[in-house]
From Swiss-Prot:
Protein name, per record: Pescadillo homolog
The UniProt record lists the keyword Nucleotide-binding: no
MF terms (GO), sorted A to Z: ribonucleoprotein complex binding; RNA binding
Coiled-coil ranges from the UniProt annotation: 292-321
Disulfide bridges in this chain: none
Family: Belongs to the pescadillo family.
HAMAP family, sorted: Pescadillo
InterPro entries (UniProt xref): BRCT_dom, BRCT_dom_sf, PES
Record's subcellular location: Nucleus, Nucleolus; Nucleus, Nucleoplasm
Keywords: Coiled coil, Nucleus, Ribosome biogenesis, rRNA processing
Protein's job: Required for maturation of ribosomal RNAs and formation of the large ribosomal subunit.
Compositional bias (Basic and acidic residues): 644-662
Gene Ontology annotations of biological process type: maturation of 5.8S rRNA from tricistronic rRNA transcript (SSU-rRNA, 5.8S rRNA, LSU-rRNA); maturation of LSU-rRNA from tricistronic rRNA transcript (SSU-rRNA, 5.8S rRNA, LSU-rRNA)
Length: 670
């Protein structure tokens, strides 16, 4: 039986847990709504289940979802929850009017003035107190909006307060309009920096207010929505993202219009013939909130260096297609390529006129019938536009013309294509956020870097380091060490990998001149040293020497060049390979010895069995053994005769004891 204090402590902990957390069932009862409405409300308000510790989860049950009680109580008086309750009351009135056949009341209830509607303005202000917080969520928002923009609606409805399990016409039209506004802003502000074509769709990156925003536009093709997906969850996110992007785009467009007006005013004052767009557009794209007077100076310098690198990146992209005119063939998705061309300062022609066009984008093995090829035009494939954007330079059209085999299309998000400071900083940030990305540099990237900078020489042109990383990946380690099973292997998490990759900073250790001890303690230490019963403390001179040696090694490692580091890594890998080879050889020897022992045991056992059978056959031939009456065994003839003679005299022959099975074991086992 538990002690009174222990029982009281358990009771206090249980009561405290009940006050802090609520289950999903308790939350729905408190809010007086169904589970579907509760989930939709949590999505709109940004309330998510909490992950408990293992002990708490074990006590409460593994299948339960827990929410913070203060967040659920905060939802009780929320205006969206009130509107949901109002809508439930309105539904009851509509059903009653339909049942009683009151057409006038039903028409009045279904009018837009009476039907309840909820607003997400206050919710967006609560979730995003600063504009930069909303910018950081634009990537998920635009990816989902672009996905639903090309899906066909299945329900005709303009309101979103009711729960729909398919895309409505109102949300579809809003998504298409939002995509059009977003692409128009990206093209006008010239903030597009990267693009990539993958099997999932088109990946883009833009720099907006000092933040890198990446979004995905899917390929537009005939689709079928997969079953088993709760679409009301996705539509709740879509509704919130549409309302959020309305605020974000209003702010961005107003800032862009203000900057353009200021630029025109300065042009009129100074009488400039050409606007210096960099002074305004880059500042508008990279305007970051004030870091505050209380922040550290290091963070301020880091933000300034990051801003300068992003500004250099935007300046290179903005004038990329300046003075060039592109004609896009009808088989090429014009929306995506027009976005890149306009964002990079180019112009898209609507008619195929030879005097104005410089480049024609065609995705066919030959020109369409009726087209005449002109010498002053370059007929390129669509990948050329993306590769020029990622390289920030007009690449040679060799290899991109019609009918030619295209070079590899490299993703600019995991590899620094230009090898510039801004690209390297962006890739390092991506690797920091996603540690599992392999830093392999393809040969095509080395070619582009050579075109940009003729004096460029690759550190690892053959990709030996990446090959070694692939050899010593998680899957290959199982091959190198056969004794290790899949159950024994535990993969590290992202935080553990980031912690392991941190370089430990050098810390100065204080070495005391003389260690002062009491007389008794000093006498004990002296005796223990003489008797060699303890590890005596290191001498001060030896400690200083070791400390200086470690510090010199750390300084040498931090100051080594990439070539020296590569050579050191290669030598370490070779040493590790030798150790692994030696271990594999030992394992192979043990396996061979075990196999030889097994084979020899089988062979010897077979020979012994054959000798036993031969002896039995010989004894049967000589008459020493004969079959039993049932014919299933053999009987010793001499032993049977002795037993018969003893029975005739009225005596009983002693039976031989059975063999002891433990006799062959060691004595300590017996």
């Amino acid at each position: 039986m538990a002690h009174k204090k222990q029982a009281w402590a358990k009771r206090v902990k249980k009561e405290r847990f009940k006050k802090k957390y609520l289950t999903r069932m308790q939350a729905t009862r408190l809010l007086q709504m169904e589970s579907i409405q509760f989930r939709r409300l949590c999505i709109l308000k940004g309330v998510y289940p909490r992950a408990l510790t293992r002990s708490k989860q074990k006590q409460s049950g593994n299948e339960k979802q827990y929410y913070l009680a203060r967040e659920i109580k905060w939802l009780v008086r929320d205006h969206i929850a009130e509107k949901m309750m109002t809508y439930r009351a309105w539904e009851k009135k509509v059903k009653r009017a339909e049942a009683m056949g009151r057409a006038d009341d039903l028409k009045a209830l279904q009018s837009s003035r009476v039907k309840p509607r909820h607003s997400l303005v206050a919710t967006i202000k609560e979730r995003y107190p600063y504009f930069i917080d909303a910018i950081r969520d634009v990537d998920d928002a635009m990816s989902m909006i672009h996905m639903y923009a090309f899906l066909s609606p299945e329900i005709k409805s303009e309101s979103t307060i009711e729960i729909h399990h398919s895309l409505t016409s109102g949300l579809s039209e809003k998504a298409k309009e939002m995509c059009h506004r977003w692409n128009r802003y990206i093209a006008r502000a010239h903030v597009l920096t990267k693009g990539f074509i993958s099997i999932k769709g088109y990946y883009y990156e833009a720099i907006i207010k000092g933040e890198r925003v990446r979004w995905l536009c899917p390929h537009e093709y005939a689709h079928r929505f997969p079953p088993g997906i709760q679409q009301y969850v996705m539509l709740s996110f879509l509704e919130f993202y549409l309302e959020m992007m309305k605020f974000v785009l209003f702010k961005l467009e107003s800032d862009l219009a203000r900057d353009e007006a200021d630029r025109l005013a300065i042009e009129d004052e100074e009488g400039l013939t050409r606007a210096n767009a960099e002074d305004f557009a880059s500042g508008a794209a990279l305007a970051v909130l004030d870091v505050g007077a209380n922040q550290a100076q290091a963070k301020v310098k880091e933000a300034e260096s990051k801003r300068s690198l992003m500004e250099e990146e935007l300046l290179k992209v903005r004038e990329l297609f300046r003075g060039l005119t592109f004609y896009i063939s009808r088989e090429v998705p014009a929306k995506h390529f027009a976005l890149i061309i306009n964002a990079c300062g180019g112009r898209v022609a609507t008619d195929y006129v030879a005097s104005n066009i410089t480049h024609v984008v065609v995705d066919r093995p030959a020109l369409p019938p009726g087209w005449q090829q002109h010498d002053q035009m370059e007929y390129v494939q669509p990948q050329y536009i993306f590769d020029c954007l990622n390289a920030r330079q007009m690449l040679p059209v060799t290899g991109y013309r019609i009918g030619e085999d295209l070079p590899p299309h490299v993703s600019p998000f995991s590899v620094s294509i230009t090898n510039s400071a801004e690209d390297n900083a962006a890739v390092e940030q991506v690797k920091k956020d996603h540690p599992r990305i392999v830093g392999y540099v393809p040969a095509r990237v080395h070619e582009i870097r050579k075109l940009i900078n003729p004096s460029y020489s690759p550190v690892d042109p053959e990709g030996k380091v990446a090959q070694l990383e692939d050899e010593y990946s998680d899957e290959e380690m199982h091959v190198a060490v056969p004794e290790m099973d899949m159950e024994d292997d535990v993969s590290l998490s992202g935080d553990e990998l980031a912690e392991a990759r941190k370089k430990p900073g050098w810390q100065e250790e204080e070495v005391t001149e003389e260690v002062q001890r009491p007389k008794l303690s000093a006498f004990k230490v002296k005796k223990q040293r003489e008797m060699n019963l303890m590890n005596a403390p290191t001498n001060e001179v030896v400690a200083r020497r070791r400390q200086a040696l470690r510090k010199a090694q750390e300084n040498l490692r931090q100051s080594e060049t990439p070539e020296a580091r590569l050579q050191r890594k290669m030598s370490e890998v070779k040493r590790q390979e030798a150790v692994t080879r030696k271990m594999q050889l030992q394992v192979a020897r043990k396996k061979a010895a075990r196999f030889y022992k097994m084979v020899s045991g089988v062979v010897q056992g077979t020979a012994k069995k054959a000798a036993t059978l031969e002896a039995k056959a010989k004894h049967i031939a000589e008459g020493k053994l004969h079959k039993t009456e049932d014919g299933k065994g053999l009987v010793n003839a001499r032993l049977a005769a002795r037993r018969q003679r003893a029975e005739a005299k009225g005596k009983k022959l002693k039976e031989k004891k059975a063999d002891n099975p433990y006799k062959k074991l060691p004595k300590w086992v017996q």
